[in-house]
Amino acid sequence: MPPRPAQTQAGSTVAEFAVALLILIMFVCAVLELARLMYLYNTLQVVTQRAAALAANVDFKDAAALDGVRQKSIFRDAAGGLILGAPVTDAHVRIDYLSLSGPAAAMMTTIPNASLPTCAANNRVACMADPYGAGCIRLVRARICDPAVAGVCNRVPYQALFAFPGLSVALPRATSIVSAETLGAPPGKAPCP
């Protein structure tokens, strides 16, 4: 069989290059998506650590201060989203105050907002009277939750940069718990009425 002329094979190189380029672009997009997902998994833990540490020193009755804590925890000075972390915003950072049930079986219990002390100085008084009482804030917890449901901490669905069929991943709750510190009360402040 005689060899084919070079003119008829000119399109095959372009077709092979196009297929190889398509596979390469899909691979690069998958690597970028995986890198972003790992970034979010690690960053959300840092976000909750920052939120819990800041909330342990902020007045729990001051809504503006708590909004500032949420904003600072996602590395912002105003309301908005986490950089490269869509859909996570400051509204996704949930801060809870916990009490301990007893020394033997120290179980953490969330204190409802209605049962929180009237001020941080009163929390000190309540904790000195009964460190395991239901109204004594001993711990501060920060979590990443879906803000659509207020009573339950549902995981936030991951929002991909590139559309991959069958990719449905939920971000972790990324919970951090720290000891309650000043809760915004300066030393020597008298209890409030």
Name each model feature, range by range:
Residues 56-193:
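Short, conserved structural patches
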